[in-house]
Regions:
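Residues at the starts of beta-strands that form the adenosine-phosphate
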Residues: 2, 30-33
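Short, glycine-rich nucleotide/cofactor-binding loops
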Residues: 3-15, 41-48
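Histidine-anchored nucleotide/phosphate-binding helix
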Residues: 14-27
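Short internal beta-strands
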Residues: 22, 32-38
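Short, intrinsically disordered/low-complexity patches at protein termini
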Residues: 29, 38-40, 57
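A glycine-rich helix N-cap at a beta->alpha junction
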Residues: 50-60
Length: 60
């Protein structure tokens, strides 16, 4: 299956879950592309104690 994920927010939980979904999908042999739109382009710079976004992005 092919998935396209559009991230249009800089809310830590939403961004973390989007990349977690993408990583899990890749591990299950699906094709995944992520498009950052609007505030989503700030994803890599988001700091959160509860959600390790940088780790999820690196795993992706």
């Amino acid at each position: 299956m092919k998935f396209g994920i559009i991230i249009n927010t800089n809310e830590p939980e939403t961004v973390w879950n989007a990349f977690r979904f993408g990583t899990t999908s890749l591990l299950n042999d699906h094709e995944v592309k992520v498009f950052l739109l609007g505030k989503g382009v700030e994803s890599e710079g988001i700091e959160s104690e509860k959600f390790n976004i940088k780790e999820q992005i690196q795993l992706f």
